[in-house]
Amino acid sequence: MPNKKEAWKEGMYGDEVREKLLEFAEEGWESIPEDERDMWFSRFKFWGVFHHRSGQESYFMMRLANTNGVLEPGQLRAIGEVARDYADGPVENPEFGDTWIDLTTRQSIQLHWLKLEDIPEIWEKLEAVGVSSRSAGGDTMRNISGCPVAGRDKHEFVDSQPVLDEISTKLRGDDSLASMPRKFNISVTGCREGCAQDSINGIGLEPAAKAVDSRDVRGFNVRVGGGLGGREPRRARSLDVFVEPDRAYDVVRAFVELYFDNGNRENRQKNRSRFFVDEWGTERIRDLLQREYVDFELRRAGRNLREEYTYNAGRPAEAGKHDHVGVHEQTDGRYYVGLSVPVGRLTATETIELADLADEHGSGAVRLTRRQNPLVVDVPEDEVDALLDAELLETHRPEPSVFTRGAMACTGTEFCSLALTETKARMAVMLRWLRANVELPDDVSQIKLHYSGCTADCGQAMTADIGFQGMRARKNGEMVEALDVGVGGGIGAEPSFVEWIRQRVPADEVPGLLRNLLEAFAAHREAGQTFRQWVDATGEESLVEFAEPEETDYEDPCLTDAKQSWYPFDDGESPAPTDARGEPISADD
């Protein structure tokens, strides 16, 4: 029997939801019947509109959809202006202030504290420059990820941008496929670094070559059934298919349709595509695709480039960082400059400043990476130094510290109904403490620190050198925010997921744990050994011993909140719900 969300989707989903959302926006928050709010909030997600967590009633988040992290000239500025004019909540975050944007791990952008009544104006402003929020959430195909410098990468193996554009336009734009069994992630990359992380997507196209009719043809191998979340991660498995670029869309569509037709619509705990691949197996899937979903012969897999992957691969410094941060030459002789934005949060002012810099020193275009960082592209060589001297780059540096460079964090309890802990402000404070209190050998260039507020793992803790997932614990008789700590994750040629070595560590003891663990790494590693290599070579018992929790002078920003307040940094009474002007709505209104 289908679950209730399937019943809701059968009643209305996809493009038709937009008109109803606009109707509610015109009539105001209170026009949504209270006993129907869960249903409408679930439907709104298709249009990237998410209601905030309990205690923040009438406030919404909007997630945008920009395939492959592409922001054309004028788009980032419009987003920054929307954040400035509309993303202003009733309280300030003590770490970030108010009016900001969040860069995501799928190369998109999220705006918070939006009022339902403002959404029509917000859509009008964004859509005027070609920015949409359609298909950015819910049970649908999410933002398609890829190499952010596709078509510009000097060392690119095959240009994936045309494939990405075709999939986005024809597949994600197809309303008949809007209601998938569950959210579905697609990645396509033609680069040699593996930065699109094909291993953790529902379907991923990776660069490959194959001899076809005595020609060495470049194209893609196909992997299916990858993903994180629920402490049940899966590596995407080879479908044993090689596809040329002009057939790539057809193969992706075929697998999407197969999952659409046959995916589990009853048990939401077991209906992600990774479980579908578990149940069916790649041989059966390949056979059915060939017989019923494509009208051309599926070739066997070609030679992949996985051994070259360096993106979050735990490889030595001499292999390169390949996270797109820093100054890099493009194929046309111009350059792109990648900024490091800790935890992916830019103020509205910084966002507009970044758009100014892109206009002044580049083509105006900006790209977003899967590490929550922006790239200014198309910078002539004689403009690079001027860009590097810009004040904004003193804050978001192209050559950041080891810890800052590797940090990512999800939304956390600030807004998310699933999260158990605050994430972004805590990570920012921890990064400052680590920079001041932990020294690493000169040849250690990266430590990936990923923080997810719950086991859904939107912050990709499972693929970190050191991953954190939010929990709760008791300390001195009081409920506090706590973290599970895992080590040894990564992507690369052979993806691995963290081993959880400490559970429910009070958040104020985690920095001390990190210092103890990293000092042990520095003391016991072999020359040139990366953290991931050291973890692989060190027994679990020793790792647990090294990772001893410890209280230090670190002051946690919201240790005792444990989601007991309406906002992690305000234990007063919630002002929500509010009207279109942000004024509280009384029970008598």
Model regions and ranges:
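Peripheral terminal and linker regions in Fe-S/redox and tRNA-modifying enzymes
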Residues: 1-589
